[in-house]
Amino acid sequence: DRSGSVETVYKRVSDCMERSLNGKALDSNSREIKAMIAYIKWVGHGVEKDSVPKGSGIKPPEYLDRAASPEKGLAVYTAKCQSCHGANGEGLMAADAKSYTYPPLWGEHSYNNGAGLFRLSRFAGYVRDNMPFNQASHKNPALTDEESWDVAAFVNSRPRPSKDLSKDWPNISKKPIDHPFGPYTDGFTEQQHKFGPFKPIIEARKKQQESKGKVAMVNKKNVKVS
């Protein structure tokens, strides 16, 4: 939906390189990209088209009745994230000085504003099920839902690289509720789409869909009558 087209595996991997890693797409004939594509196809072997394998994806925490708070998130970050990711979100470089033991969460070496993690639900869901490292799992989270939303708000309010997103979401009605860049079809602000509260947006979109469904039924009846 983001690109408005059917995407190849190469396109999906390239998006990860350019957005989540804030890097460049690999040459389509490179050894590395061929290896990644082969691995992805192997993992997906036997999975039926349009099905969702059990345990895949990121499930957002329970939506809050308030906006996620960067201020409260700072306290969570300081207490539970800073020891690995650094006071300034710089991460921890590995001994080889070529990679990171703990990745940077903001700044020039972090993911850019086009990455999936820049959406609060993606970040909050990921940290709720996985962080702090070696202390949490999806069955035994170490962070509460509130802490997950708030620390996501804090990290995603910090400076990071920007990507040209002008061609994203050609059908704006399909933008996720937490996509933080307008325009939108629902009348809510960019601020609310970024930090919430998200429940009013969900309810408004539900009503939009119900209204569209009623219009479609009326049109269908009119066609039959004519």
Regions found by a protein language model. Name each.
Residues R2-S14, E18-I37, K41-H45, P161-S226:
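N-terminal export/targeting leaders of redox proteins
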Residues H45-T78, L92-M93:
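Electrostatic cytochrome c docking/interface patches
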Residues E7, A35-A38, G57-P61, A79:
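Acidic/His-rich structured neighborhood in mature extracellular/periplasmic domains
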